[in-house]
Curated annotation (Swiss-Prot):
Taxonomic classification: Eukaryota, Metazoa, Chordata, Craniata, Vertebrata
ATP-binding keyword on record: no
Location in the cell: Secreted
PANTHER family linked to this entry: PROLACTIN (PTHR11417:SF5), SOMATOTROPIN,PROLACTIN (PTHR11417)
Disulfide bonds: 4-11, 58-174, 191-199
InterPro entries referenced in this protein's UniProt entry, alphabetically: 4_helix_cytokine-like_core, Somatotropin/Prolactin, Somatotropin_CS
Family, per entry: Belongs to the somatotropin/prolactin family.
Organism, as annotated: Alligator mississippiensis
Gene Ontology BP, a term: positive regulation of cell population proliferation
Protein name: Prolactin-2
GO molecular function, one term: hormone activity
Name of one Pfam family that matches: Hormone_1
Length: 199
């Protein structure tokens, strides 16, 4: 849904509505990320021992994120908003390459391809929505430009199939993890900023 109908003048969507849309979108992205990871796991990762190798290998690890709800509640809302922006920006590049590289996986099902494209598009939409929210909550501030650079493209193009599939597995595992974090942070922010923490 477009935030404002085209051609509309002085269209003002409430902050509450912007948050509603962002939370729905982040929930949808997390749902798709989980589905895509599970599908990939079932189809390509069985018996390869990937899960034991995949601990703490996410490119967003350099962004300090709260581990649980209690920790997140200790963080000022401006810092939490900037953190959400940082994580979303950190995924722009990997998602773009994921869409291209996943097509080269042997017998990759259409459902995985479709989800990769959909997540990439929806992540961009969520980032735009979050920039609007930050502009509304912190006028004149589009958030700091801090994000984690991703250098994983060569590993998605390795000749060795096992190593390449592990790189995909790890990226999808991280996508599921980060989309879950964003979903939780947005719910917390919405509760704090829209409902005065009465949730």
């Amino acid at each position: 849904l477009p935030i404002c109908p085209s051609g509309s003048v002085n269209c003002q969507v409430s902050l509450g509505e912007l948050f509603d849309r962002a939370v729905k979108l982040s929930h949808y992205i997390h749902f798709l990320s989980s589905e895509m990871f599970n599908e990939f796991d079932e189809r390509y990762a069985q018996g390869r021992g990937f899960i034991t190798k995949a601990v703490n290998g996410c490119h967003t690890a350099s962004l300090t994120t709260p581990e649980d709800k209690e920790q997140a509640q200790q963080i000022h809302h401006e810092d939490l908003l900037n953190l959400v922006l940082g994580v979303l920006r950190s995924w722009n590049d990997p998602l773009l390459h994921l869409v291209t590289e996943v097509q080269r996986i042997k017998e990759a099902p259409d459902t995985i391809l479709w989800k990769a494209v959909e997540i990439e598009e929806q992540n961009k939409r969520l980032l735009e929505g979050m920039e609007k929210i930050v502009g509304r909550v912190q006028p004149g501030d589009t958030g700091n430009e801090v994000y984690s650079r991703w250098s994983g493209l060569p590993s998605l193009q390795l000749a060795d199939e096992d190593s390449r599939l592990f790189a995909f597995y790890n990226l999808l595992h991280c996508g599921r993890r980060d989309s879950h974090k964003i979903d939780n942070y947005l719910k917390l922010l919405k509760c704090r900023l829209i409902h005065d923490s009465n949730c």
